[in-house]
From Swiss-Prot:
CDD domains: RWD_RWDD2, RWDD2_C. This is RWD domain-containing protein 2A. The lineage of its organism: Eukaryota, Metazoa, Chordata, Craniata, Vertebrata. Pfam families: Prp3_C, RWD. It comes from Mus musculus. The gene is Rwdd2a. InterPro entries: Phi-like, Prp3_C, RWD_dom, UBQ-conjugating_enzyme/RWD. Residues 14-134 form the RWD domain.
Length: 292
């Protein structure tokens, strides 16, 4: 492990050198600990035994249009760039909602990088290229002569069908991705496998992309429901969390991986969550009303 940490620290020093060359003026890059880089160099040279603290710093970015500043707070974990970078952008010109949306978009961009890729410089470039729209939205809301339109988001619900979902590692991945992206819904394991995911459109689409790749072939999105909302979408959710749905197998198959799920139980589950109409879409079978 020490070798990988040292390799990571060497890459961090390299990236810090690039940052200081990009921001040569005093105060543009502010280290939380002015001795941080010296301590890391001593550790790499072997004159310091204890692992030095993480590199933490703030970069003040000047955005040209509109004329505003962003303070980018960065923490480099010891194993960065092989683990995720910790960073957050702040500006007094952004309200809480716009600042949240800006950082969510920045985080989504950074997740496209492969482990081992340095990304602080790329994050800076992304902010310089993409942050203006978040400030312009705030500017419109501050102008009394113009009635600002609320920011609209698309709330999406996807119904995903798979021939089967058995493997433990796949089931674990689905749950982890669902909880990380702050979506709600369920994953019904067995044969067939059904996944419902709901939340803001960008989160659902990232979920769909992540679980499909690199090699899940027998899976498709059978149905999608979307609606524009100006709120947080909580009132549109049919589920309160993202959980694994375990129903009885149809017949006594024990632990064999060829059991069919009890679709009658699944239909009752859909009814409880106001989704009975999806049953026919998923299976081509018209559900029988419980009132008939």
């Amino acid at each position: 492990m020490s070798g990988s940490v040292k390799e990571s620290l060497q890459l961090q020093l390299l990236e810090m050198e690039m940052l200081f060359s990009m921001f040569p003026n005093q105060g543009e890059v502010k280290l939380e600990d002015v001795n941080a880089l010296t301590n890391i160099k001593r550790y790499l040279e072997g004159t310091r035994e204890a692992l030095p603290p993480n590199i933490e710093f703030v970069i003040t970015l000047q955005i040209e249009e509109p004329k505003v500043t962003i303070d980018l707070q960065v923490t480099m974990p010891h194993n960065y760039p092989y683990v995720a970078l910790q960073l957050f952008g702040r500006s007094p010109e952004l309200d809480r909602q716009q600042q949240l949306l800006l950082n969510q978009a920045l985080s989504a961009y950074l997740r496209t990088f492969d482990p081992g890729e340095l990304c602080v410089c790329a994050a800076i470039q992304w902010l310089q290229d993409n942050s203006a729209s978040y400030f312009l939205t705030r500017k419109l809301s501050d102008e009394p002569s113009v009635q600002a339109k609320p920011v609209k988001n698309t709330f999406l619900r996807m119904w995903i069908y798979s021939h089967h979902i058995y493997q433990q590692d796949l089931r674990k991945k689905i749950l982890e991705v669902g909880k990380r992206l702050d979506v709600t819904g369920f994953c019904m394991t067995g044969k067939p496998g059904i996944i419902c995911v709901e939340g803001f459109k960008n989160h659902c689409e990232e979920f769909w992309h992540t679980i499909r790749y690199p090699n899940w072939k027998h899976i498709s999105c059978k149905h999608a429901e979307s609606v524009e909302t100006e709120g947080d979408g909580e009132d549109l959710r049919l589920f309160h969390s993202f959980e694994e749905l375990l129903l009885e197998a149809h017949g006594d198959y024990g632990l064999r991986n060829d059991y069919h799920m009890n679709l009658g139980q699944f239909l009752e589950f859909l009814r409880k969550h106001k989704s009975e109409h999806v049953f026919q879409i998923l299976f081509g079978i018209e559900s029988k009303s419980s009132e008939s």
